Amino acid sequence: MSSTIFSEKKSENHNILWTFFAHNDIIVPVPFLKQRKLLRKRHLWGSFIGVYDNKEEKEMKVTKRDGRIVDYDRNKIVIAIQKANAEVDRYEQLADDKIESIVAGIENKHADNLLVEDIQDMIEQKLMSEHKYELAKKYIIYRYTRQMVRQANTTDDSIMSLIQNSNKDVMEENSNKNAYIASTQRDLIAGEVSKDLTKRVLLPEKIVKAHEEGILHFHDMDYFLQSIFNCCLINIGDMLENGTVMNGKLIESPKSFQVACTVMTQIISAVASSQYGGQSVDIRHLGKYLRKSRKKYEKHYNKKYGEKISKEIRDEFVKDRLHDELRSGVQTIQYQINTLMTTNGQSPFVTLFLNLDKNDPYIEENAMIIEEILNQRIEGIKNEKGVYVTPAFPKLIYVLDEHNCLKGGKYDYLTRLAVKCSAKRMYPDYISAKKMRENYEGNVFSCMGCRSFLTPWKDENGNYQFEGRFNQGVVSINLPQIALTAKGDEEKFWPLLEERLSLCFDALMCRHHALEGTLSNVSPIHWQYGAIARLKKGEKIDKLLHNGYSTISLGYIGVYETTKIMTGVSHTDPKGTNFALRLMQRLRLACDTWKLETGIGFGLYGTPAESLCYRFAEIDKKKFGEIKDVTDKGYYTNSYHVDVREKIDAFSKFKFEEQFQKISSGGAISYVEIPNMRHNL
């Protein structure tokens, strides 16, 4: 059989292009609509005789469910109807010319772009108009079967690979979780289910697509299924003073330091089980209970011995007993935090804030507590082999102020001890009270976990409040990808940045809306019993999501790489610094603008990107190839940090990064790697 096109003629009365074929020496005219790109020839004598392609015709496009725009392919429509056709009796089947007519009717819409759903709706209507009800039913079943396949659970492989210990991406995503332990695996399995539902059901397709393409990173999808938040500053002072409730049991205010330490660790564990980020505790609130213990021992020895022994001896007894309780209480904190397992499959991610406030009536007791915490951290905790090692938690933050900055202050001895501790155990981290007061309206307070900072907020009485506040969640933007897409052209870079920021805003609002309407019953320890608030049972948490009470964070990755692409130099070079600062200021302006427009506490946040810096770089390397100093390294530099390959001394690095910390007030941390300093203190 042979078929040859030998002439074409346009009809004057119809917008149809007639194509004449020589089919086995018989001239066959076949009409085709002008708007077709790729047209299968009319069905003749039970066989198709070729394909017609008029390249001058306007291309027809189809918009898929995920927003992608693809070329129109009529074959897919024909195949779908034919599959339904094969499912019904012969008398219910639709003839091939009728199928062709349906397809032609769709193509005759003269639309440059059709939605997939619209095409399917038209097919169903056509089948019904032909009175092919059984066929229409089969097509509808076919349509929705395909939809179910698209929306089918996609977690089987990831869950089975977790159980088989072969899913390295998930197992290594969080270094604080031992993915081989059954209880941790249960959390990771739940996380895979949450990620699957988040992508298929909860998030708009454009956000999921942006996440998959590395345009942005929607953090903590594995917990997005539930109405829980990121990180917080526990209002531990209120909980210890006014009591709390755990597992339906009333916990009254402690009468001693040891009990206060035990209750605090129980609170930390309960809080960690109902949120996914870090938490911080200001140990200043423990000083009061150490004094209670002192008074208890003084009363005991006065009653027991009276004037039988001198006051000096009684004071020695009190001192010894108090020191024993102090050591035991701090040891309780350290061991409980490192041995308790929360429902999210790890030890509580908690930070102890070691701050001596000169106006604190319990400053002497708190100095004793800080000293014991540092001494026990220097000692370490024994591992299973009996060797002292550095515990991962609690993370320690030590505040440097006028009275302990090694300039003759009363508490300089604590700073020397902290330095000794850092040299051996890497912690504590340090905060400058002076710099914090400059950047946070005169206030000194802890970050939430590792680096997320609240913005100043005043209650109805005009008093600043930080404890009992939280962060709603994080979305991070991939800055180097914008520069790579713009090919280093600033005229393209800045408009594209605006588009990506708009996408990040939408993603962040998804986080915010997911928390709106949440009832306090979801986590009583947070919302009803003091960690965050003392709401009524069944009360919505919405008022805590607005007016800047809580924060929501825009993270960012790769200021160094972005600057390198756009300027050709590092952001430590004056030319690069100028661009990097403009970029950071634009990110900050976006957050400030969103905050004004919505009343929600948007903040700019230097993302903790231990795994994300690799993910973004890997995605971009596949798309843009290996680019020197950008994708060839296999990672992007975290936030505004100096590239680790750059030769720069520790003090110069801190000085350089300081200017970015002021802009990134919603979260910032700077660090250096140093050799063994234990013999250089």
Question: Regions from the language model: what does each represent?
Answer:
Residues 48-162, 166:
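Charged, amphipathic alpha-helical regulatory modules used
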Residues 354, 552-565, 585:
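Contiguous, well-ordered alpha-helical segments that form the cores/surfaces of helical PPI scaffolds
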Residues 148-149, 156-548, 569, 573-681:
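Conserved catalytic cores of very large enzyme subunits
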Residues 77, 81, 286, 290, ...:
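Buried hydrophobic packing segments
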Residues 4, 16-27, 34, 40, ...:
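Short, positively charged and aromatic/hydrophobic N-terminal segments
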